[in-house]
């Protein structure tokens, strides 16, 4: 069954395994998430657990959000997500999900929003090669010809534009260490997003059986 938790990206560091191998890891701080709602087939048409992360100031909330959080005997949350394919009997409204639900060696998928780079050209955005610098060349960093046949820009054409700021999931990352007293997960490798950005960690969908 799927496990999941919301947290924030602290940054990257490195640790040594028992065999003395240096492993780069991402530090994810995941303070306890609160179960706001348990959805069932009878009431909602599908099964899921709704969790909330990070308290929201009362002045920024509204009455529906306050009422929804009050059912779980908690304050309104800034971030709310759903986790599907879970064992519903393991969750109760108002209970907490902590990093203890994961263990070392678990394979997870990590979702975050990539860092925004603003408007960028083809070389930075798509990794295209640049043209000659000298000998009368007028082709340096421009995209180049798109052809003269179809008289339109084909869908998906790689052109300059906004780079980054997209939701990305990195699959099959390994949890190297769990630090319950600090609410921290150490995940092998890098994950999308800037420091302090929202991160969603859940059991891998395509992990080797």
Curated annotation (Swiss-Prot):
Keywords per UniProt: Ribonucleoprotein, Ribosomal protein, RNA-binding, rRNA-binding
Gene3D superfamilies reported in the protein's UniProt record: 3.30.160.810, Translation factors (2.40.30.10)
InterPro entries attached to this UniProt entry: Ribosomal_uL3, Ribosomal_uL3_bac/org-type, Ribosomal_uL3_CS, Transl_B-barrel_sf
Segment forming the signal sequence: none
Chain positions covered by the region annotation Disordered: 112-146
BP GO terms, sorted: translation
Biased composition (Polar residues): 112-122
MF GO annotations: rRNA binding; structural constituent of ribosome
Entry GO terms, CC: cytosolic large ribosomal subunit
Segments crossing the lipid bilayer: none
Purpose of the protein: One of the primary rRNA binding proteins, it binds directly near the 3'-end of the 23S rRNA, where it nucleates assembly of the 50S subunit.
NCBIfam families: L3_bact
Family designation: Belongs to the universal ribosomal protein uL3 family.
Quaternary data: Part of the 50S ribosomal subunit. Forms a cluster with proteins L14 and L19.
Official protein name in the record: Large ribosomal subunit protein uL3
Provenance organism: Lactobacillus gasseri (strain ATCC 33323 / DSM 20243 / BCRC 14619 / CIP 102991 / JCM 1131 / KCTC 3163 / NCIMB 11718 / NCTC 13722 / AM63)
Organism lineage string: Bacteria, Bacillati, Bacillota, Bacilli, Lactobacillales
